[in-house]
Swiss-Prot record:
SUPFAM superfamilies referenced in this protein's UniProt entry, alphabetically: HAD-like
Binding site for IMP: 153, 155, 161, 189, 377, 385
Record keywords: ATP-binding, Hydrolase, Magnesium, Metal-binding, Nucleotide metabolism, Nucleotide-binding
Protein name (Swiss-Prot/TrEMBL): IMP-specific 5'-nucleotidase 1
Length: 451
């Protein structure tokens, strides 16, 4: 009998962002009807310019209409009728928006950067819509309440996969600029180290530049924190430490129901996950090592080898299924995440519906995040990035989700651990450290224009 997991894997519905795909489909109609692929560029320059102008107007009208639908969806959420908006009927997987999104204005900006309306052979793409949504989110943050906290993923967001944040990285001056503006900065990474030295090795370039920066005050330096293991270890900047970081005890930042998680249950869940991982290693003959940590367990390839995507996804799905069917897994809600599968998301949301202001439920619960943080390994972590971002908000005095931006690259593919941050803050979806630099420069431009 075909299982639900195998069907979902085959359909790959969890590899699509439904809102982006829906908007992309709307934009395909004017592209098909108004593009002129047979026109000769030199002979029809005037005609092509007119067509580009007309196409821009039609695209802009679509984004204006979608913006109105988003505003209507937000109004329904505020009135307690989130499931009854027209957008929810059109895109059932659409989630919570913490700010308005200025889509029309964002499209005008990105069209000037990417010349979307002038293209005759390539329709508006997934990446076009993704970047327009990023711009719309930045505009929403600056237009409304302002920005108080920016959190970043590590790999592929601040530095290349498996690399370190070196002193010559162009992202460092942008982070320094955020701190100078009084904006708090958190680095929320899947790397689960219990000591400062490992994080210093990864972030040495940034930490040393901060120490030597004469235009940073001590108060501004203290606005940088590092959350490791998704949501398990917090470190703050400390210039007096040899590694520029100091461990923050859990009781100083743990939030709500996280304090109710029993060590016995955590150990039992990780034991089950480890057993399942070892079974996968044997069954698939994986050339990997098993690593058990305080609040995580996972597998990674030996000798810097590579695993196929199918091997990684099979391992993730097997472990997710095993933990879910265990006694402790059925007793305590958890999140076993492998991309944007409707089942995984709905299972999480049944226990943790998105809220504009987070309020921990009365009953204790526990979450597990099963991810591929580096793209070539599988780790089971207690908690996920929604808890990591919330803990950062709590540490800085309770910053509202509508004043928080999480920047990350993993919102779609298997092991997309940044996806959960959408439950705790606004988000920007980037694809490389270079895009992070562009995003922060765009934010600075918007802040100056609207100041």
């Amino acid at each position: 009998m075909t299982t639900r997991y195998r069907v979902e894997y085959a359909l790959k519905s969890h590899r699509r962002d439904q809102l982006i795909e829906w908007i992309k489909g709307l934009l395909a109609v004017p592209f098909v009807l108004h593009s002129q692929p047979t026109a000769v560029q030199e002979e029809d320059a005037t005609k092509l310019a007119a067509v580009a102008h007309d196409t821009h107007q039609r695209y802009a009208e679509i984004f204006s209409d979608v913006e109105r639908l988003l505003n209507d969806h937000i109004d329904h959420e505020l009135s307690g009728a989130a499931g009854k908006s027209k957008l929810k009927l059109l895109v059932p997987t659409v989630g919570t928006f913490f700010t308005r999104l200025y889509l029309r204005e964002a499209f005008d900006y990105q069209d000037r950067q990417r010349f979307i309306s002038r293209r005759r052979f390539v329709a508006p793409s997934f990446n076009d819509v993704r970047l327009i949504l990023n711009s719309a989110q930045l505009l929403g943050l600056v237009h409304t309440k302002g920005l108080e906290l920016v959190t970043f993923d590590g790999d592929v967001t601040l530095y290349d996969d498996g690399a370190n944040l070196n002193a010559d990285s162009p992202v460092i001056p942008r982070i320094i600029r955020l701190l100078q503006q009084g904006i708090k900065v958190g680095i929320v990474t899947a790397a689960g180290y219990t000591d400062e030295a490992k994080y210093y090795e990864r972030l040495q370039g940034l930490l040393d530049v901060m120490r030597d920066a004469s235009d940073l005050t001590d108060e501004q330096r203290s606005a940088l924190i590092v959350m490791g293991g998704e949501s398990n270890y917090l470190f703050r900047y400390d210039a007096s430490s040899p590694h520029r970081l100091t461990y923050v005890p859990r009781e100083n930042w743990v939030i709500g129901e996280m304090a109710t998680w029993e060590e016995e249950d955590i150990t039992q869940l990780l034991n089950i996950a480890e057993s399942s991982l070892r079974a996968c290693v044997a069954n698939l003959n994986l050339p990997v090592s098993v690593l058990r940590k305080d609040r995580a367990v996972g597998v990674f390839p030996k000798n810097r080898g590579r695993l196929s995507r199918e091997q990684l996804e099979e391992t993730v799905l097997v472990v997710q299924n095993t933990v879910e069917r265990s006694q402790v897994g059925s007793r305590l809600p958890f999140c076993a995440f492998n991309g944007c599968s409707p089942f995984f998301v709905s299972h999480y949301l049944r226990h943790h519906p998105p809220r504009r202001k987070y309020k921990p439920p009365i009953q204790p619960c526990m979450l597990i995040s099963i991810t591929q943080p580096g793209g070539n390994d599988v780790f089971v972590d207690i908690g996920d990035k929604s808890w990591g971002v919330r803990a950062c908000q709590q540490y800085f005095g309770g910053i509202d989700p509508s004043r928080t931006l999480h920047v990350g690259d993993q919102f779609l593919s298997a092991g997309a651990n940044d996806f959960k941050a959408r439950l705790a803050s606004t988000t920007a979806w980037i694809a490389s450290p270079a895009e992070t630099v562009q995003l922060l420069d765009e934010l600075d431009t918007i802040q100056k224009v609207l100041a």
